[in-house]
Amino acid sequence: MEANMPKRKEPGRSLRIKVISMGNAEVGKSCIIKRYCEKRFVSKYLATIGIDYGVTKVHVRDREIKVNIFDMAGHPFFYEVRNEFYKDTQGVILVYDVGQKDSFDALDAWLAEMKQELGPHGNMENIIFVVCANKIDCTKHRCVDESEGRLWAESKGFLYFETSAQTGEGINEMFQTFYISIVDLCENGGKRPTTNSSASFTKEQADAIRRIRNSKDSWDMLGVKPGASRDEVNKAYRKLAVLLHPDKCVAPGSEDAFKAVVNARTALLKNIK
């Protein structure tokens, strides 16, 4: 009789992980963590001094996860403090303020700082990164749109979420996906799962969208010199049209970039005899 009874499923073994937050001062790193861990929002800004440390427990599938969170100060003054905390990290919460373009532009510098501190033997490919486009509740002041932020994140194989520490929007979903990805990382021998490491578009497509977005005029948008001939304009247009056509390119912002290229070509050809 006992031999035919269903076996009780053994609970998954516990797991300890290290998570750090990165990003400029005042982007809301601490507020995001407090919103998730303490279910509250602190409206008064209190700058993080050096490092804030906290521990929380979560459950992913059948495993208990003990999360050690190191909330790192974003001010350059605290570099000598935070540079000791990059190593042995499984997950990074990379935060910028959608109303502060400089905080978005600084993301590359934060990655460079981490890479430098990990040294030649450090491998950032085996760390789960989640990008939080924070303060989306401040719609009037937004200057970094979703497609721009998502393009940057996904081109690097990072997770991307739109969040508001004030309202709580996107916070729980972000952390749940983040922790699941870290558990998958640990269960995959410390290697980032393929689904999280490869973008569904090319670097050439991502670079073209960024260039078009930041171009100063129609000539610059098509990548031709002012005064270019009709044939040169059409040749440049065809190359970009093939690269970015919405039917073949799924990169965030590709549809807007394609429309901008079409409009740029039309505007230039009107003035070329």
UniProtKB/Swiss-Prot annotation:
Gene3D superfamilies linked to this entry: DnaJ domain, P-loop containing nucleotide triphosphate hydrolases
GO biological process: intracellular protein transport; positive regulation of ERK1 and ERK2 cascade
Entries under Pfam families matching the protein: DnaJ (PF00226), Ras (PF00071)
Domain of life: Eukaryota
Positions of GTP binding: 23-30, 71-75, 134-137
SUPFAM superfamilies referenced in this protein's UniProt entry, alphabetically: Chaperone J-domain, P-loop containing nucleoside triphosphate hydrolases
Entry's Gene Ontology cellular component terms: cytoplasmic vesicle; nucleus
Tissue expression per record: Overexpressed in gastrointestinal cancers; expression correlates with later tumor-node-metastasis stages of colorectal cancers.
Keywords on record: GTP-binding, Nucleotide-binding, Nucleus, Oncogene
Subunit structure: Interacts directly with MAPK1 (wild-type and kinase-deficient forms). Interacts directly (in GTP-bound form) with MAP2K1 (wild-type and kinase-deficient forms).
Its job: GTPase which can activate the MEK/ERK pathway and induce cell transformation when overexpressed. May act as a nuclear scaffold for MAPK1, probably by association with MAPK1 nuclear export signal leading to enhanced ERK1/ERK2 signaling.
Additional observations: DNAJC27/RBJ knockdown in several colorectal cancer cell lines is correlated to inhibition of MEK/ERK activation, cell proliferation, colony formation and in vivo tumor growth.
NCBIfam families membership: small_GTP
Name of the protein: DnaJ homolog subfamily C member 27
Organism: Homo sapiens (Human)
Gene this chain is encoded by: DNAJC27
